[in-house]
Amino acid sequence: MKNTELEQLINDKLNSAAISDYAPNGLQVEGKETVQKIVTGVTASQALLDEAVRLQADAVIVHHGYFWKGESPVIRGMKRRRLKTLLANDINLYGWHLPLDAHPELGNNAQLAALLGITVKGEIEPLVPWGELSMPVPGLELASWIEARLGRKPLWCGDTGPENVQRVAWCTGGGQSFIDSAARFGVDAFITGEVSEQTIHSAREQGLHFYAAGHHATERGGIRALSEWLNENTALDVTFIDIPNPA
């Protein structure tokens, strides 16, 4: 498949053109024209690029790519080494950020809901769905369930939350700023990847459980699902590689 055809295929699947983002979605660094072997991962770190080189991949597809708004345009140090690895090995780099959070099937939010057994009921605002667990569970039990499913112990604050949790809102990655919207909507718990200092005060003062389950851990699902979709629907050879990250 041509590198530009792959870009169009995924853009169409994720409806990228309809979503404004903080970084370019699609082909970010051009490599060889023909793509067959692909490595995917959450972030285009040096470790992932090194794996792509080792596996002789033609392309790398990630959720967190390069060239973010507000980022320094200077190419030096870490950025130079990463780009040099791609260019020297003629590897294409593709990134899809918010489109891969929001997609109702392959998106990070949809995949997290499926993993945790949450039935999606609607959306509080863009990128913040809400839903229900099959039955009410104590806050500590939900924390244990999140740990079991994600392989990472979440930071849990349930000081003033209800005895049991059933109505849940969530936003994968760095979605802690949405806690107030979730509280106003009226859920028992809010799940995201990261926590800020003020997040805990918001949870305590508004009476809901809060879980910070890891930016990386909550965003493995989307890129993994996209990898599976490509393997099932094309003749491409796609391998998801999880580079461990406790954050």
From Swiss-Prot:
Keyword field contains Ribosomal protein: no
Swiss-Prot/TrEMBL GO biological process terms: DNA repair
InterPro entries, per database record: DUF34/NIF3, DUF34/NIF3_sf
Quaternary data: Toroid-shaped homohexamer. In the hexamer, 3 dimers assemble to form a ring-like structure surrounding a central hole.
Binding site for a divalent metal cation 1: 63, 101, 219
Keyword Metal-binding: yes
PANTHER family: GTP CYCLOHYDROLASE 1 TYPE 2 HOMOLOG, NGG1 INTERACTING FACTOR 3
Family assignment from sequence similarity: Belongs to the GTP cyclohydrolase I type 2/NIF3 family.
Keywords: DNA damage, DNA repair, Metal-binding
Molecular function terms, GO-annotated: metal ion binding
Protein name per Swiss-Prot or TrEMBL: GTP cyclohydrolase 1 type 2 homolog
Residues where a divalent metal cation 2 binds: 64, 215, 219
Function of the protein: Provides significant protection from radiation damage and may be involved in the degradation of radiation-damaged nucleotides.
Gene Ontology CC entries for this record: cytoplasm
